[in-house]
Amino acid sequence: MTSTCTNSTRESNSSHTCMPLSKMPISLAHGIIRSTVLVIFLAASFVGNIVLALVLQRKPQLLQVTNRFIFNLLVTDLLQISLVAPWVVATSVPLFWPLNSHFCTALVSLTHLFAFASVNTIVVVSVDRYLSIIHPLSYPSKMTQRRGYLLLYGTWIVAILQSTPPLYGWGQAAFDERNALCSMIWGASPSYTILSVVSFIVIPLIVMIACYSVVFCAARRQHALLYNVKRHSLEVRVKDCVENEDEEGAEKKEEFQDESEFRRQHEGEVKAKEGRMEAKDGSLKAKEGSTGTSESSVEARGSEEVRESSTVASDGSMEGKEGSTKVEENSMKADKGRTEVNQCSIDLGEDDMEFGEDDINFSEDDVEAVNIPESLPPSRRNSNSNPPLPRCYQCKAAKVIFIIIFSYVLSLGPYCFLAVLAVWVDVETQVPQWVITIIIWLFFLQCCIHPYVYGYMHKTIKKEIQDMLKKFFCKEKPPKEDSHPDLPGTEGGTEGKIVPSYDSATFP
């Protein structure tokens, strides 16, 4: 690289050293942008951690063993953003470092202390969740309050052992004027670099992947079991609905048959009575008809016409009954058709949607899977094969695990990669300044991610946070004095009455 100093500059300013372009400090605009983004991250992290800490402190029942680990994680983040981050923001201004190199070493050690404490806590949380899900019966006896506190103390003790070697000579820290950052000189001590990288990302990633892989498999099996149980309950429900509809249809048919038989008997009796009456009338007329046979014959013909008309009327009534029977049969068929349609669109209520867990939901495809299609061959209809497990049962656990691991790698992965790269490459001159700035942002981004990943994704904690924010921002207004005009003591209740005031009682 060429030097920024010319011969004339060297002669006139012999006391100033020449600085190559590769070691030029960051510009003022670069420093302002870095500081602004850091301040935004720190403000978001401060608010998120404080709100979550207040929720955990307000509800003592939430401070179980697992949530105590989460609370310890919040403490490490708050210490990081309150004791370390302000100095990082201050040093982002070009050519500004107010203190000596010893303070720089102490600042790097303090940064690593809180970072290692955070990493160790995340590892403990992973193991704790593994034990609580895979061994739920023995978990209370294994993870007692005493062991929980011992693990918390252990995270800080191990973090102190991991972060303090630069203070007694194992590793070296200095202020990087080019990148405006107080950082480790990783190439000066490769052994400490290897120890830091293994402690930062290798061991934690192995533990997290191992624990959460087993947890994911267990969650998948549990969801599959719950899905099969719900599927069986849906089958039973469909069968019960069909049986009830069939029973109601059979009862309606029996009632209709009884009514039709009763009507037929009643009509037969009526016709028999009418025939008897007509026979009596005919005999009377025959006795009285000595004057002429023509009248009796005419009357006989009239009786026959009456009988024919009654027969036609009875036939019409029978046709009407048959028509009503057909209408009722059509209505029964329509009811059966509705029953068959309803089998494919069962209305699932809240009790059906929740079975042991809140996330078990059945879509229309799942409900249709309960009904075996009639078009399939009998070999497939009688098979015991279950429908494939819906994706929603697997994506929930996979999403949570992915967010946990990805956020961890995103925050500390670039920092560890830079440390390994510094063993072979001169980071101060070869790595672009914007890359260093992005790595700094990602390093402090974990303080913003931890409250969301380990706090707000928990349903109980999320509900408590929402309740607290509602009480804080939506305060209930006190009732007005005239809201109850009929009660004594209010303006409406004291109208037209003399009520002595406090002043009149104490002063003449």
Swiss-Prot record:
The chain crosses the membrane at residues 36-56, 69-89, 107-127, 150-170, 197-217, 400-420, 434-454. Residues 250-288, 318-338, 476-485 have a biased composition (Basic and acidic residues). Disulfide bonds join C104-C182. One of its GO terms (molecular function) is G protein-coupled receptor activity. It holds the Pfam family 7tm_1. Glycans are attached at N7, N13. Residues 244-338, 476-508 are annotated as: Disordered. GO terms for biological process: adenylate cyclase-activating adrenergic receptor signaling pathway; positive regulation of MAPK cascade. GO terms for cellular component: plasma membrane; receptor complex. Residues 1-35, 90-106, 171-196, 421-433 are extracellular. Belongs to the G-protein coupled receptor 1 family. This is Probable G-protein coupled receptor 101. It comes from Homo sapiens (Human). The lineage of its organism: Eukaryota, Metazoa, Chordata, Craniata, Vertebrata.
